[in-house]
Design a protein with these regions (language model features):
Chain B
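Soluble N-terminal domains of membrane-associated systems
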Residues: 1-93
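Juxtamembrane inter-helical linkers in multi-pass membrane proteins
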Residues: 96-98, 161-177
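Alpha-helical transmembrane segments
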Residues: 138-152
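Structural signature of hydrophobic alpha-helical transmembrane segments
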Residues: 141, 200-216
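Alpha-helical transmembrane segments of helical membrane proteins, especially in multi-pass transport
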Residues: 154-158, 175-206
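Interfacial loop-to-transmembrane junctions
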Residues: 220-244
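Juxtamembrane boundary at the C-terminal end of a transmembrane helix
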Residues: 245-258
Length: 240, 258
């Protein structure tokens, strides 16, 4: 049931990111939360949503260029992390490192789906050329309403691809991650730190995606100011 | 417009705008957003051309190539309806709406991509990420609500202005100074990403591994430099995970290196 819900969320996101509305609902930050929610673990969704949003901040459709399919990757990763953590908890595992470790492992396993999604999108574009031909055909037959309506048929294939692939990725994560972590419980803290370093790198990727001439300067200024503020808070006894 | 000239009723205009949200539903390499544009403008054509043959001809001219930023395209859709009304009234030749689209799609695509896709949306993405780190999901909901309030107000405004002003929409959009604003938003976004990196590092201090804070700060700094030198994003991301895992293993084996 959760896999079906993940499929529906992924399908909706695949349509929203390009074919309909584009209101940031298919961005990793929103989608990770939604995927986590339908998989029964909002925290897991938010844990991956933040680094994935920043990592793929530059994933935008500019002209005919195709970015990675960040929506497909996000649902698979967030769903996989949530389901894997659920299996691990059911097996008696726990502790603060469990969720970040499951999230890091889900990123490692499912991030390539974002690349696969981009390839699939190329196929969709070719398929849509057939829809163009169909619209011309309908118009030649005199059915202008049918010719105009053809546009909506373009929604089906992106929906179907993500509906199938995202739950599949989540299922692989939910199976492989608990298997690995139950056999190698010592991997939990290293993977948790892996998520921290990935998150830190994602911030750099986000700043780089800003495409501003002085972005580097402002990014490092923000980083240093933030660290300085943190150090001052710790020194003042406020704690992290 | 002369007295009694055909006008598109408000209901049909609203349907056109609603349909424009599906502009890229069947994006294809040959006509790009052509199917979406034809779908969006169809209610207006139905209202203007009762004669089926004339309407078919009108739809055929909108099945030609079209590509623009999906938000900014609302202005062109509104303006094209404006021109179609003139065509229906006999004030312009049938080629006028097509020429209007061809003239505006490039410049408005550049403005839309530059402002929305590479400035406003990334900034709100970064803000949502930082807000979620600090305050959880309510900050996420609030950020998305603000973004969409801006997005929808501009999108609807573009459509209305295009419809009412026709060719003058260019001047109206130019007065918004979106490219200059975009540069400031991008810089703000970079600053927010820097603050996010500091926040991630500060929170790393809570991970039960000494040196996590330093590792996060170092990766945030070196990561930017690596990307600036052309490192591929995916490989660099995997390397970042490997750094964290490797550091934790080293700490486990040899004690804290930092």
């Amino acid at each position: 049931m959760k896999l079906l819900a993940l499929g529906l969320v992924a399908g909706f996101a695949a349509v929203e990111r390009k074919g309909f509305l584009q209101a940031m609902l298919s961005r990793p930050i929103a989608l990770g939360a939604m995927a986590g929610l339908v998989a029964g673990d909002l925290d897991a969704g938010l844990t991956v949503a933040v680094p994935l949003e920043l990592l793929w901040l530059g994933a935008v459709n500019l002209g005919a260029a195709l970015p990675v399919h960040e929506a497909l990757g996000t649902v698979a990763i967030a769903g996989g992390a949530a389901l894997a953590a659920e299996v691990l908890r059911a097996g008696g595992a726990g502790g603060p490192a469990l969720l970040p470790a499951a999230a890091a492992a889900a990123v490692v396993l499912c991030a390539p789906l974002a690349l696969l999604g981009r390839r699939a999108e190329r196929l969709v574009e070719r398929w849509n050329e057939r829809l163009y031909a169909r619209a011309e055909h309908d118009l030649a037959l005199g059915d202008d309403e049918a010719a105009a309506r053809v546009n909506l048929y373009g929604i089906a294939l992106p929906f179907a691809i993500s509906f199938l692939l995202a739950p599949l990725g989540a299922l692989v994560s939910a199976t492989a991650i608990p298997l690995f972590l139950e056999r190698v419980p010592g991997a939990l803290p290293p993977l948790a730190l892996g998520l921290v370093t990935l998150s830190a790198f994602s911030c750099a990727a986000g700043a780089k995606a800003m495409r501003a001439a002085r972005a580097k300067l402002v990014y490092f200024a923000g980083l240093l100011a933030g660290l300085g503020l943190f150090a001052a808070t710790v020194l003042a006894g406020g704690g992290p | 417009m002369k007295e009694g000239a055909p006008r598109v009723p408000p209901g049909a205009l609203a349907r056109c705008f609603g349909r424009s949200l599906f502009l890229q539903a069947a994006w294809n390499r040959r006509g790009m957003q052509n199917l979406g544009f034809a779908y969006a403008i169809f209610p207006a054509l139905s209202a203007l051309y009762a004669d089926k043959a004339v309407r078919r001809e009108a739809l055929a001219r909108h099945l030609g190539f079209f590509n623009c930023h999906p938000y900014a395209a609302a202005a062109i859709l509104g303006g094209t309806i404006h021109h179609e009304e003139k065509v229906a009234a006999g004030l312009e030749p049938p080629g006028a709406p097509v020429a209007y689209k061809a003239t505006l799609q490039g410049p408005l695509a550049a403005i839309g991509d530059g402002f929305f896709w590479t400035a406003l949306r990334p900034l709100f993405g970064a803000l949502a990420a930082v807000g979620t780190l600090l305050f959880g999901w309510p900050a996420l909901v609030l950020t998305l609500t603000i973004y969409n309030a801006i997005h929808l107000v501009l999108r609807i405004g573009f459509f209305r202005t295009g419809y009412r002003r026709g060719d003058d929409v260019v001047g109206v959009i130019a007065r918004l100074s979106l490219p200059a604003m975009a540069e400031r938003l991008r810089l703000a976004g970079a600053g927010v990403c820097g603050a996010a990196a500091a926040l991630v590092a500060a929170r790393a201090d809570q991970v039960p591994r000494s040196g996590a804070l330093y590792a996060a700060a170092l990766v945030a700094a070196l990561g930017y430099c690596a990307l600036a030198r052309g490192a591929p994003l995916f490989l660099a991301a995997y390397a970042a995970v490997a750094v964290g895992v490797g550091l934790a293993l080293l700490t486990h084996l040899f004690g804290s290196p930092l």
